[in-house]
Amino acid sequence: MKPFLIAAAVGLFAAPVFADVNITADMPWVTVQTEDGEVEISRIDDPAHELSGEWARTSRNCPNFCVQPMVPAPGVTPIGELELLNMLQDPDAIVVDSRVAADHETGTIPGAISIPYNEATDRLDELGCELDFDGFDCEAAKPVALFCNGNWCGQSPTAARRMIEAGFPADKIHYYRGGMHAWRMLGLTVTGGR
């Protein structure tokens, strides 16, 4: 009996210990609606978890991967993860993954729709604008949050500028500059991808 107790005690101390890793002190998770049903967004419950591969890189060549401004165009509102989570739960808001399809397919934020930055001005109707004789009427535009790969990625800033040029109201655009890099760094849920 004694050897069993010793072995059990050693096993307990050798097992990994996972602490609660909440989003905030009073928010362990958030549930969002996606086209595939409800998805729970939470953080990876392992304080020892580390990023690897492409997401662990700290430097990229500039140009093309230059640090982006907090505000990509006048009137655009920069947001962080908590504001993005609020928008994901708001039925009137749309969260847009502005990355090219190949990037989107590696995984995305649950509840985001894919509108690549180079298609944004052709798809404003999906964001509450109506097609008219002169292009788009964006009087009824919905609040939109744009994101891409991270603070070194120019895809969502380019989408924001092009949308504004096409008539989308700048004050309806929110920019999550941290993008997938910050999202993954925080261990938040990612859907799709390989």
Q: Where in the sequence are the language-model features?
A:
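Bacterial N-terminal signal peptides
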Residues: I6-P16
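Flexible, polar/low-complexity N-terminal or interdomain linker segments that lie immediately upstream
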Residues: V17-I94, A101-T106
